[in-house]
UniProtKB/Swiss-Prot annotation:
SS bond list: none
The enzyme's E.C. designation: 2.7.7.56
Tagged with keyword Cytoplasm: no
Gene name for this UniProt entry: rph
Protein known as: Ribonuclease PH
Pfam families, per the entry: RNase_PH (PF01138), RNase_PH_C (PF03725)
GO molecular function: 3'-5'-RNA exonuclease activity; tRNA binding; tRNA nucleotidyltransferase activity
Keyword line: Nucleotidyltransferase, RNA-binding, rRNA processing, Transferase, tRNA processing, tRNA-binding
Length: 238
């Protein structure tokens, strides 16, 4: 039995609230249960120096957590003068995931930066960030089309992510903190809506997992991501 009473394949209640902030071209409050992340997509009419003159755009991301997003206060990374390794790993994952969903040549020499700020953490902050960032990115691109900065949509499709793991000997989907902290295996999966995988990150925390357990977790991830992408589509249709 899971702490929340969910079935093995059941994701948490997911909410995607668009236009959550006033100034960004795309903004979303994404909620996976008690995990809440604000994702804002900002458009700039320039690209990194190494891309100038190449006719391609760029999509990047930054990630951070409020000090009291967790049970006890964490010191702001800005106060220590540098980002932690976990933060850098997560924001690179978010950026890679979003770039996989965009035709950078069709974007032209423009850059979109997606900021993912965790305001409350209960497991799965990176997967929630990717899911919300995809919707914020879609809104930013639609804004670019509406304002004449793009002639066509460079997005190849929706991208979403979910965590899976082995908890109490069972493969489960979308782990909350109580499950994540006690899981034998923890894995994050990022997929496009056509089912193609962008990233699979998996680690045996307490005990090695079998090939069959890997297949079971990937099957749960695909089912969960299919459900999440339907929620993305519904949010963008509103």
């Amino acid at each position: 039995m899971r702490p929340s009473g969910r079935t093995a394949q059941q994701v948490r209640p997911i909410t995607l609230t668009r236009n959550f902030t006033a100034h960004a071209e795309g903004s979303v409050l994404v909620e996976f249960g008690n995990t809440k992340v604000i994702c804002t997509a900002s458009v700039e009419e320039n690209v990194p120096r190494w891309l100038k003159g190449k006719g391609k755009g760029w999509v990047t991301a930054e990630y951070g957590m409020l000090p009291r997003a967790t049970h006890t206060r964490n010191r702001r990374e800005a106060a220590s003068g540098k980002q932690g390794g976990r933060t850098m790993e997560i924001q690179r994952l978010i950026a890679r995931s979003l770039r996989a969903a965009v035709d950078l040549e069709a974007l032209g020499e423009q850059m979109i930066t997606v900021d993912c700020d965790v305001i409350q953490a209960d497991g799965g902050t990176r997967t929630a960030s990717i899911t919300g960032a995809s919707v914020a990115l879609a809104d930013a691109i639609n804004h670019m089309i509406a304002t004449g900065k793009l002639k066509s949509n460079p997005m190849k499709g929706h991208v979403a992510a979910v965590s899976v793991g082995i908890y109490n000997g069972e493969a489960i989907c979308d782990l909350e903190y109580l499950e994540d902290s006690a899981a034998d295996t923890d894995m994050n999966v990022v997929m496009m809506e056509d089912g193609k995988m962008i990233e699979v990150q998996g680690t045996a925390e307490e005990a090695p997992f079998s090939h069959q357990e890997l297949l079971d977790m990937l099957a749960l991830a695909q089912q969960g991501i299919n459900d999440i992408i339907e929620k993305q589509k519904a949010a963008l249709a509103e």
